[in-house]
């Protein structure tokens, strides 16, 4: 049981246009989404060809601890609203489920991340692909822990690679038990060291002006890999693709996480730390699709959508389109795309 801080799907968020109530080719996501309550003990594993489960992480405590601009706790609501009208560009054998939200209210960040970990573990055990809606980027720690917990039932030492699209390395120092939205990948490194696990971390879109020299030194010490945003924007992308290939070949599983501040503020103004020289979303989506085609990706999240700063829901809409691209790409991999 996930307790009172888990709230099952609120179907009110799934409202939109209806062109037909019978012709699936005219369906939008709000017509195809099904609620799933992770608190139920009698849930049976999904036996269809391909299923996705959305779960929101309504939290910005990590952002507050990181002295950023709070507001991302409301992100999952607005992302759902933007996803509602997306078209079903897949066959009816692809199923979409909404697993509700983890609410980090009147509990600690660490308790919230533990709840998310349990939820991710359960979603994976149901044979569904988790897509987490943030929430601050502290969502990454809970998502990773859930993936790790699930994979340990298969292999005591799973080989998991992390690909993070982010302007920040997020490997800041932290006090034990008090992480933030800027510490997750250092916390994961510490867990890997403690449990003798492989630590494989690649950060795409790093901004030199957003990280201290000590953080780059720490990244090198930890064996983390990173690609600067300027090298993606102005460099030879084939070199970046080769770097991705080298990284992905060494992994058995890949967890992909996107911090919305990786994007230029022209496309993503509603974030905690906006980036005037961030990446063009088209470039990021191209890399995400390439990573997905490795067929190793086990979980995905997009974080730091903050409605408080998001005039016209521009950033939430971008997050929805990124998620659309994820589902569209995986559906095509399974031969279920249209």
From Swiss-Prot:
Gene3D superfamilies: Ureohydrolase domain. Mn(2+) 2 binds at residues 166, 168, 259, 261. Pathway: Amino-acid degradation; L-histidine degradation into L-glutamate; L-glutamate from N-formimidoyl-L-glutamate (hydrolase route): step 1/1. GO terms for biological process: L-histidine catabolic process to glutamate and formamide; L-histidine catabolic process to glutamate and formate; putrescine biosynthetic process from arginine, via agmatine. GO terms for molecular function: agmatinase activity; formimidoylglutamase activity; manganese ion binding. Keywords: Histidine metabolism, Hydrolase, Manganese, Metal-binding. NCBIfam families: hutG. Catalyzes the conversion of N-formimidoyl-L-glutamate to L-glutamate and formamide. Belongs to the arginase family. This is Formimidoylglutamase. It comes from Clostridium tetani (strain Massachusetts / E88). The gene is hutG.
């Amino acid at each position: 049981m996930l307790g009172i801080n888990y709230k099952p799907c609120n179907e009110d968020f799934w409202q939109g246009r209806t062109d037909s109530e019978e012709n699936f080719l005219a369906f939008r996501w709000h017509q195809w989404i099904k609620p799933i309550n992770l608190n139920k003990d009698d849930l049976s594993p999904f036996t269809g060809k391909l299923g996705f489960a959305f779960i929101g992480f309504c939290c910005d405590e990590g952002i507050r601890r990181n002295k950023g601009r709070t507001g991302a706790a409301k992100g999952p609501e607005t992302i759902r609203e933007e996803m509602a009208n997306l078209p079903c560009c897949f066959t009816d054998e692809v199923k979409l489920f909404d697993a509700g939200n983890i609410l980090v209210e009147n509990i600690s960040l660490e308790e919230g991340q533990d709840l998310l970990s349990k939820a991710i573990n359960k979603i994976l055990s149901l044979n569904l692909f988790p897509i987490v809606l943030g929430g601050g980027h502290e969502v990454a720690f809970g998502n990773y822990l859930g993936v790790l917990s699930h994979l340990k039932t298969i292999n005591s030492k799973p080989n998991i690679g992390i690909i993070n699209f982010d302007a920040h390395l997020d490997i800041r120092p932290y006090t034990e038990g008090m992480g933030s939205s800027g510490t997750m990948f250092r916390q994961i490194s510490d867990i890997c060291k403690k449990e003798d696990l492989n630590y494989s971390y690649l950060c795409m879109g790093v901004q030199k002006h957003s990280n201290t020299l000590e953080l780059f030194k720490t990244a090198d010490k930890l064996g983390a890999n990173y690609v600067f945003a300027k090298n993606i924007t102005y460099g030879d992308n084939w070199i970046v693709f080769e770097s991705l290939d080298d990284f992905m070949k060494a992994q058995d599983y890949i967890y992909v996480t996107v911090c919305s501040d990786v994007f230029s503020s022209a496309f993503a103004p509603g974030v905690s730390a906006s980036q005037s020289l961030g990446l063009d979303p088209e470039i990021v989506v191209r890399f995400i699709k390439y990573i997905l085609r490795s067929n190793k990706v086990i979980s995905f999240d997009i974080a730091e959508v903050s409605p408080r700063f998001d005039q016209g829901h521009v950033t939430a809409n971008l997050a929805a389109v990124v998620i659309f691209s994820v589902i569209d790409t995986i559906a095509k991999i399974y031969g279920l795309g249209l």
